Amino acid sequence: MLFPLQVAAVTSSVRDDPLEHCVSPRTRARSPEICKMADNLDEFIEEQKARLAEDKAELESDPPYMEMKGKLSAKLSENSKILISMAKENIPPNSQQTRGSLGIDYGLSLPLGEDYERKKHKLKEELRQDYRRYLTQGITQGKRKKNFLSTSETDPSTLGVSLPIGERLSAKERLKLERNKEYNQFLRGKEESSEKFRQVEKSTEPKSQRNKKPIGQVKPDLTSQIQTSCENSEGPRKDVLTPSEAYEELLNQRRLEEDRYRQLDDEIELRNRRIIKKANEEVGISNLKHQRFASKAGIPDRRFHRFNEDRVFDRRYHRPDQDPEVSEEMDERFRYESDFDRRLSRVYTNDRMHRNKRGNMPPMEHDGDVIEQSNIRISSAENKSAPDNETSKSANQDTCSPFAGMLFGGEDRELIQRRKEKYRLELLEQMAEQQRNKRREKDLELRVAASGAQDPEKSPDRLKQFSVAPRHFEEMIPPERPRIAFQTPLPPLSAPSVPPIPSVHPVPSQNEDLRSGLSSALGEMVSPRIAPLPPPPLLPPLATNYRTPYDDAYYFYGSRNTFDPSLAYYGSGMMGVQPAAYVSAPVTHQLAQPVVNTVGQNELKITSDQVINSGLIFEDKPKPSKQSLQSYQEALQQQIREREERRKKEREEKEEYEAKLEAEMRTYNPWGKGGGGAPLRDAKGNLITDLNRMHRQNIDAYHNPDARTYEDKRAVVSLDPNLATSNAENLEDAANKSSGHMQTQSSPFARGNVFGEPPTELQIKQQELYKNFLRFQIEEKKQREEAERERLRIAEEKEERRLAEQRARIQQEYEEEQEKKREKEEEQRLKNEEHIRLAEERQKEAERKKKEEEEKYNLQLQHYCERDNLIGEETKHMRQPSPIVPALQNKIASKLQRPPSVDSIIRSFIHESSMSRAQSPPVPARKNQLRAEEEKKNVIMELSEMRKQLRSEERRLQERLLHMDSDDEIPIRKKERNPMDIFDMARHRLQAPVRRQSPKGLDAATFQNVHDFNELKDRDSETRVDLKFMYLDPPRDHHTLEIQQQALLREQQKRLNRIKMQEGAKVDLDAIPSAKVREQRMPRDDTSDFLKNSLLESDSAFIGAYGETYPAIEDDVLPPPSQLPSARERRRNKWKGLDIDSSRPNVAPDGLSLKSISSVNVDELRVRNEERMRRLNEFHNKPINTDDESSLVDPDDIMKHIGDDGSNSVATEPWLRPGTSETLKRFMAEQLNQEQQQIPGKPGTFTWQGLSTAHG
């Protein structure tokens, strides 16, 4: 039940005075939370006090205790104070203890013996341990797991259960662990150094005790300390204490009581070990302590290994007077007070370099005053400076006084309130500073927080990029503890028995002020960067009760750069420089060093030398004694030896650590650990086993038990390719690895081989079986791949054959189609050739018949000419002609001229052709010349056909002239002529106008004409029947109407011609030749009608076969009125049947060539020619009666023809239209030129242009 009392007392202490509870900035932050718990625990504290009062009553009533009745009440009250103050301060049990601090020896002053006290303390310790285990039972495992992960160790409780899974701690956890580790190391050093000094002091008899008491009255150490403390407290007291001084004394008393109480737990054990340590003090206490640490049953070996590693990482915090292994002696129960919050244990140790000088010093007299040195420590719970000697004396006097707690009043409460407020402000500043540091670390993305330079995840040079490498010349001196100004120190005493000479200014607290200087505050913590610097100018003298607000943690971290990446920056060799404590001290005193782990032969000499060398007490002698110099030299040599040993050990540990890192690097698996769902891989990252395939094989084995043999082999085969490694390699790897790191194998046999044993025969056999099975699998896989490749090859060949056959079939079909196409083309070509041949034969037959007819016609013409000559001669003799009318003189002269014969025409044509050929430009193509030469042969035949057509036209015109009045207007459509030749337009890049038929509908007049023509065509008549046979469809527009009207007129004219030919024998023989001559020379409006009705709707210039060019066609081609026959002549011709000049009707245009296929119908031409020949024969055989003109005309047809106005019918059938072939045009142009040459004075006579090219 003691431990809950401690917790409650701590809470109460924090509430009363939080400055006394501060250990570090982190514990300051926790203090508000603890203050909140204080109100709830007040009742619990009162109950504990009542229980203690009951115990007191029982002890008083007990007979063995009645012997000490006079002292029991005081002691028991002081014991209660000790318990409460210990719980408040929570001072570690091995903290510093002074010889004359408290005059109470709890438990040892009873007459029950040492066995009773030993059992009592043992029971108390067991109760504490049980209660602590109860509190930390559920959380210790998780915290230990984090500790294992942070130190890269393996939890032994998880061995054989599962593979360790590497977890990463957060930055906050790593920071906390690193801080705890650093401060624990610091506290352990302080504890061990203080323990060493206490052991030396216990072995030394105080000088004041010898002076006041005889030797026979000396009692055991603890009893003598109590009596000495009480005797020292009875010394005279010159000063009157103020409330502040009383408060300071009370605090000192509490601290001393707590140190005393903490020591009681280990007092029996220390008493047993004291004699052994005395004998082994000179040799070294580290070996014995190491053995004691190793012999502890509560701490496992694995934890001991971790302590070694921590020492390696925290080497920079070692002190020159600190043994490397002393820190391991600290018991594990002092590390943490409670594992549920991992709070830093209040283990307050002191590792200052002059700690051995601050033990229980013998009292020195100054003017009758007893000067006693008390053990003043730097407490992280009160942030106090070293108290002065007067305060210590008053505290020692109050130790035996029950009224010590009643010396301060309202003024002390105000001071406590001010300190609390100051403490609260400091906490707020620290919290703000911590937030700023976190924000800066986050902004700069630093990987170093407050975890120090030993973070295993960060490289030593990680801060170079931020230019934060340590710069010694820029660093500032850490804060110093305040001190009172002092005079120049005097040289120390040569002998401790000589009384000191009083100083010039006898200040009672001079020695304490000297101890509170720079050497006292920073001697063991300040790094060597401030060693050669003198202290700053001294401040004015301070009051004796002045308290600094800083604690040990402030001075500890203030003198160190936690972000320094260099390990050597805080090496053990650099931390042992003693700073200059005084400005005016001699050089010999500034080099004073503490005595570490050395025990002289004379205890009194050692103690006095420690006091002298510490520089805390000065004497009047100017030179030290030989003994002090000798001890100083021995201390220096001892320090040099220890430093060399320490460096050697550090080198060994560094080599061991590097070897361990190399071993870890060799065993590092970049692919991660297998198992737990992760695939098993070899060193190269390849999968060792395929779990999916194994699962399928298991299913197949369940359904097919016959194949179970292969599955059994797979199940027992080792999967670890590293089992065949040699035994030496396994041993070497196991030696290089840390004991906390477990080497996990990716094999099912790894659990039996975790310590590097060589593989057994069974494992080797299984490995061979596995290798054979792997080879079997490889062969089987190769066979499957080969079979697959063969199957693919066969499939590809089959596909290629199919494609080849398909290509051949397509090619054959294509060739067949091409052959069929060629056959069709050949057949079509043969058919065309046959048609052409037949057409040529028919053409030749027609030409032969034409030649025969032409011959017959020539004979007839010759016969007619002869008859005309005979008739002319007869008429000359019979009567004289009437006088010629002047208007008809030119016409008559033209009538008297003989028409040219066929031979003359041919000769003139050849002549003109030769002349035009000589003058023709080299424009025409060769083909036109060849074609013209071939066409020359057919010119005569064409002329004969033209004569027949002229004869029929002549008769038609004669009939019309008889029935027309002289004042009838001849409507002639004129066409605008393009004044520019077509080639000139092409040369000037002009577009020739094209006349197209208007798309408009029929007007009323045209529609009426069509209707009347249809009625006329339906009448029964021979000519109309032929017209219906030729034109089956009725006319639809003006153009077709003109064509059919012209055809009807032509048929009627044929009928009239036949009638006239029947009565041709009766006509005068001169009428026919004169009429034919006039017909041949009759001027015609050839150009106007040709261009007006031609299908070629543009004015074009044409080039002849021999290169001649046609002249421009004139629009004014109508004969003058003088050339028109008069009414008298028309009446005369009517009665005499003479042909007179008159305007000829319009001729339908013809845009087709003479020998075009569309205009030549061989069968129709043959029938018509036969009909003409028949009529011609009848005309020759039957005599013509020229006097009876009525026999030549059909009265009905004449009357019907008169009623029809054919002036608008200017079109004709294509084969009856005027010739438009180039040959006829050229021939007519030649004829025109020839006629103009013969009769220059008569232009425009005898033109062949515009004649019909019909073959009928």
Curated annotation (Swiss-Prot):
Post-translational modification as stated in the protein's UniProt record: Phosphorylated. Phosphorylation increases in colcemide-treated cells.
InterPro entries from the UniProt entry: CSPP1
GO CC terms in record: centriolar satellite; centrosome; ciliary basal body; cilium; cytoplasm; intracellular membrane-bounded organelle; microtubule; nucleoplasm
UniProt name for this protein: Centrosome and spindle pole-associated protein 1
Coiled coil segments of this chain: 38-62, 114-135, 244-270, 417-449, 625-669, 925-964
Polar residues composition-biased segments: 222-232, 736-748, 1246-1256
Source species taxonomy: Eukaryota, Metazoa, Chordata, Craniata, Vertebrata
Keyword Isomerase: no
Key word Phosphoprotein present: yes
GO BP terms in the entry: positive regulation of cell division; positive regulation of cytokinesis
UniProt function note: May play a role in cell-cycle-dependent microtubule organization.
Tissue: Expressed in adult and fetal brain with enrichment in the cerebellum. Detected in testis.
Organism: Homo sapiens
Assembly and binders: Interacts with PLEKHG6. Interacts with ARMC9, TOGARAM1, CCDC66, CEP104 and CEP290.
Chief subcellular location: cytoplasm
Disease: Joubert syndrome 21: A disorder presenting with cerebellar ataxia, oculomotor apraxia, hypotonia, neonatal breathing abnormalities and psychomotor delay. Neuroradiologically, it is characterized by cerebellar vermian hypoplasia/aplasia, thickened and reoriented superior cerebellar peduncles, and an abnormally large interpeduncular fossa, giving the appearance of a molar tooth on transaxial slices (molar tooth sign). Additional variable features include retinal dystrophy, renal disease, liver fibrosis, and polydactyly.
Record keywords: Cell projection, Ciliopathy, Coiled coil, Cytoplasm, Cytoskeleton, Joubert syndrome, Microtubule, Phosphoprotein
Subcellular location: Cytoplasm, Cytoskeleton, Microtubule organizing center, Centrosome; Cytoplasm, Cytoskeleton, Spindle; Cytoplasm, Cytoskeleton, Spindle pole; Cell projection, Cilium
Basic and acidic residues composition-biased segments: 189-208
Phosphoserine: residues carrying this PTM: S244, S459, S527, S901, S920, S966
